[in-house]
């Protein structure tokens, strides 16, 4: 059996742990939804480089040093050289994950380099990296195969990439980019054992002594009968936000099962961070869960809850923009969107509703930062709001 066949077999086995969706209402996912995703990909590829910022293609993450905001240091690592940036808050980051049979990661270890899931600097020259498309459009077929391989490894023998997604490595990259704090968002997979990234990450952060800079979040699984009790325990540990991932956890955001969770978050002032929209590289059977219209019920029913829509709706950003315009209790994480779309988000949603996020360790922190610096050139107040002010207010329980 070759590597690709072996990977497919393992992937099917891993998928069986969570399973495809049960039958649900046909209107939950229509043929027109499938067609719109295909059209978005086609149109984005066609329009790349034709927006207000022209072509923005670079040779790997190190290639971002061609921009006036970065340089390569003595170790050939990317470093931000903008001197007047605010203390940046990354509202969308993670640590390495290991679950089921995989050995526990040493989150306090330091390695020579970080192996991002899109490892654009693994080769010299690096892979072509386009800042004017949704970020995962930069994944080539081999990159996706590697990502799938590492995803399976996180549940079995252990992921070599995930072993580099540690606290010292994250802090090193944060320091190089001028990022002061990062919100770490775990995901409960609903597995029978070895599935408590929230507690493990919190313990690692405490052991590192870096709790002022790294802010662990909470997570619950919608079908966990003890979800509310679990949430309260995580909040007692100091959780900064609740992460829910409809695609990975296979639920609709408007499911009645989550009503007590939303109500609790409103009561205690805890932001709810949703993965939002279809990224386009996840299993197709999960696409139905993340359509923007499925977030409407929860957001409308809980105006007291501060919701964050991750990835600005990903490839469904065209639906996410009017959704955010309609609901004043929705903030938008800008991670993943290209520079032309980021400009549109500022103009139509408003800079005061946008949050800087990196989705580290999928990508280098500089990938998201570069886009903000390009689009906010000459607009210091907009830059400060996106990189710091909005997140600081949200973490302080303000905004509504």
Language model feature labels by segment:
Residues 1-7:
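Twin-arginine (Tat) signal peptide motif
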Residues 7-17, 29-82, 86, 103, ...:
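Mid-to-C-terminal alpha-helical segments outside catalytic/metal-binding sites
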Residues 65, 180-274, 278:
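Active-site gating/metal-coordination segments in enzymes
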Residues 92, 174, 265, 332, ...:
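Conserved, mostly hydrophobic/aromatic
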Residues 92-98, 275, 311:
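Histidine-centered divalent metal-coordination motifs
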Residues 165-170, 198-203, 227-228, 291-295, ...:
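Alpha-helical scaffolding within the catalytic cores
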Residues 239-246, 250-355:
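Catalytic pocket-lining loop regions of alpha/beta-barrel enzymes
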């Amino acid at each position: 059996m070759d590597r690709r066949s072996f990977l497919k077999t393992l992937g099917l086995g891993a998928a069986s742990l969570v399973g495809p969706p049960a039958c649900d209402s046909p209107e939950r996912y229509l043929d027109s939804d499938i067609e719109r995703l295909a059209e978005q990909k086609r149109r984005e590829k066609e329009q790349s480089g034709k927006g207000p910022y022209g072509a923005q293609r670079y040779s790997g993450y190190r290639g971002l040093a061609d921009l006036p905001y970065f340089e390569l240091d003595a170790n050939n690592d990317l470093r931000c050289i903008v001197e007047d940036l605010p203390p940046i808050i990354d509202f969308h980051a993670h640590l390495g994950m290991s679950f089921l049979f995989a050995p526990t990661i040493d989150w306090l270890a330091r390695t020579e380099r970080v192996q991002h899931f899109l490892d654009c600097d693994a080769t010299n020259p690096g892979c072509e990296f386009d800042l004017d498309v949704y970020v995962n459009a930069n994944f080539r077929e081999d990159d996706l195969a590697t990502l799938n391989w590492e995803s399976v490894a996180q549940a079995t023998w252990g992921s070599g990439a995930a072993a580099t997604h540690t606290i010292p490595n994250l802090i090193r990259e944060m320091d190089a980019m001028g990022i002061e704090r990062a919100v770490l968002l775990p995901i409960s997979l609903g597995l029978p054992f070895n599935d408590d990234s929230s507690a493990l990450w919190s313990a690692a952060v405490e052991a590192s002594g870096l709790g002022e800079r790294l802010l662990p979040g909470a997570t619950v699984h919608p079908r966990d009968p003890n979800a509310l009790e679990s949430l309260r325990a995580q909040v007692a540990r100091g959780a900064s936000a609740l992460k829910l991932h409809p695609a990975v956890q296979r639920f609709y955001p408007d499911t009645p099962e989550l009503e007590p969770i939303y109500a609790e978050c409103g009561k205690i002032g805890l932001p709810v961070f949703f993965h939002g929209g279809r990224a386009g590289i996840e299993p197709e059977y999960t696409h139905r869960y993340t359509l923007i219209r499925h977030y409407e019920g929860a957001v409308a029913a809980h105006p007291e809850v501060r919701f964050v829509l991750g990835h600005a709706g990903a490839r469904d950003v065209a639906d996410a923009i009017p959704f955010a315009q309609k609901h004043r209790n929705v903030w938008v994480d800008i991670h993943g969107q290209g520079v032309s779309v980021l400009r549109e988000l500022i103009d139509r949603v408003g800079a005061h509703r946008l949050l800087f996020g990196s989705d580290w360790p999928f990508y280098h922190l500089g990938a998201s930062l570069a886009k903000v610096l390009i689009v906010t050139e000459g607009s210091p107040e907009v830059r400060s709001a996106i990189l710091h002010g909005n997140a600081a207010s949200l973490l302080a329980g303000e905004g509504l």
